[in-house]
Amino acid sequence: MRALVKFLGVTLLALLVAAYIGVGLSRISFNVDILRLLPTHLKQVEGLSLFLKNFALPDELIVTIDAAEPEQAKAAADAIAIALQGRPDLVKMAVAEAPWDNNPANLSPFLTFVLLNQPPEKIREIAKQLAPDQAAYTLQETLEELNSSVSPIKVAMLTYDPFRIFSSLMDSALSGLSGTSEFSSKDGTFRVVYVQATAPFPDYQKTATWIKDIKALCNEAISGSGVELGFTGEPAFVAEISTDMQGDMMTSAPITLALISLIFWICYGRFLPLLGLLLMLQLIFLLTLGTAGLALNELTIAGVGFASVMIGLSVDYGYFIYQSSLTHSGTTRSLQWNSLQSIVWTAGTTAAAFFALNFSSLPGLSQLGNMVGIGVCIGALVMLGLYAPLVLKFRKPLAAPKTSRLDAVVTSDRFARVGMWITLGMVVFLLGSLVFKGLPDSDFSAATFRPRKSESHAALSKLYNRFRDDRGFLSLIVSGKNESEVWERLNRAEDALQAAKSNGTARHFLSPLPLWPELTHQKANLAEIKTLSLQSPRLKSSLLDNGFTEEAFALASAVFAQTETWGNHPLPIWPTDQASSWILRRLARHDEGNYLALGIVEPSPGCESALVASIQGEGVHLVSWGTLGDQLKQTLPREILHVSLALLAGILLILLVALRSIRAVLLFTITTSLVLLCLAGAMSLLGMQWGFFNLAAVLLLLGTGTDYSILILLAFKRSGDATQAQKQFASVIFLCCTSSMAGFATLGLASNMGLAALGQTCALGLLIDGMISLFILPHACQWFLKKI
């Protein structure tokens, strides 16, 4: 009966655990927004978040077409647009040319909107140009300029605007539409098709499937034409990065498990204990991932890296228990009790290190810390509660204890002696490198967040190279609770930008102020333009008398008609036609409670920081990925230092309680400092750079690599013999160090460059930490703790 109850209890527990894991896994999604990794209080992060949320166009894919001849590129663009428009189940709109290219009159609602937003005095100036005594003079000026101008843009504009109603706006509202095209390069051999999805994407899997379908349709449409296609834009980035993140998580854990299996087999050559260890690690991984799904809902780029790190750390407790079981002759409970102290102290400091990342203002690191910290705690419990009983059951009755194959090597005097000299040589060499080469360089640019290989970024770079390259420009983002608040802030920003242009910190800027409605302006200008529209017969007759055709009056006539249409429209007016929507989609947002305007500023070289400081204010952001990198370079090292010092203080307090020796704590501090200095020297020697991700390696090393020092110090406290302490934990430190290095080294293969840098830095740091702790610290203990 007791056996049946026990069986039912175990079965019920297994079902509950499976349900818990299943529910958690079903809730996981990926967030590829790199700004989710960064401090939200930074103005650059806040401004770029507004930009990505409102102007990144998550449903718009950009298809680039590169051909040898302009005609070939045009034909391919048209063929792709037609093919995609034939699939309304996938595509809402495929645009291969500007909506006003074939008929400039399509611009009339937008041009009317721009006129309505001008200061009333400007509209009165235009009215004077059209007065009976000035109209003919204005037309003669236009004819002279048409005959002498070498600018095709100006000629085209004056041909449709002989009364110069809109030409005066070329330097402001329309300057962003002149000189360049967002559909074709100047030579016509590079073109772009903008593709909008039928509906928003619910998740990254649907995005990836949609991208795959669009690629197939595009390739079929231009089959055999010899043109080269590229795909970029927000959907392409989301699909690419999310797929890479999923692949990283699904491949890093198995590779880590394979490396751990190899290490275990080389050391012990036992199949059943290895199988049990792998099952425990998979259970720990699933429990941690399920917990993350319930608690976090979505994983960032940093969170994806937790799997290999957590497995590499949790296996340490399994190694320790198995190594202890080889010479254990008591019960399961006594094995658990004997292992408890070392595991609690090492797991406690490791978990504390990762949980301490919550004191940082970096959400990405906080998520990584929480996931690994939870995993380490779960790992310690699973190894003590489940693996310890298993390893004793796997041991054959009456068989002689079987030690590790490496015990004879790693516990030998020769191994300790050679290891000490090699480690001393390494320390001297790395410290010398640090002295002569200096500290490693730093790189906090957006490039460190990107995938190693990215088709979408390659397509975007080609687009920048063939069109206007505005990557050095700053985005002006102005937000407010309503139109009036945004308009007031835009005015202040424009005054500040004019001052910046005068003092040389800004070269040029495109302000969205002429595109932003102001109620009193629109009301006054509607009345003024209505008055002008009543003079249409006179204006048209004057135009014909001066040698222009009726077609030259079509645009002005359409504007006058649009003014009549908007006569009784509630103010402020926003146009809703296709051409206006196309232009404003990247310049303005006016949803209820979400009002934003976007402009562009070209800074003078080297003046970016000063310009940002002079313009930025409440509701006004001047941002770019470059200025974000500069801000991170200033704030992150200081923040990491503060968190590291707080974490180190916590670890020292724990050690003071455990060791009850100020000298031992001081020795631990010296050892940790030496490890970090050697790591800096190694990075400088190898040309590695500090960045957002691998700065966090300092925190991770404080929680992972310090375990090796703690084990030696605890063993020395118990025995008082440094040689015995070294031999007791030589195998354990070797196994723990190699397995943790395997976890981080696997992370070094990640598709994301920043995450890979974190893995490489931590693996290098663990190697240095393990060698110093195993080969130098015991001698330091013998000398420092006995003689001082």
Model feature map: region roles:
Residues 294, 310-326, 340, 344-359, ...:
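Transmembrane alpha-helices and their membrane-interface boundaries in multi-pass membrane transporters
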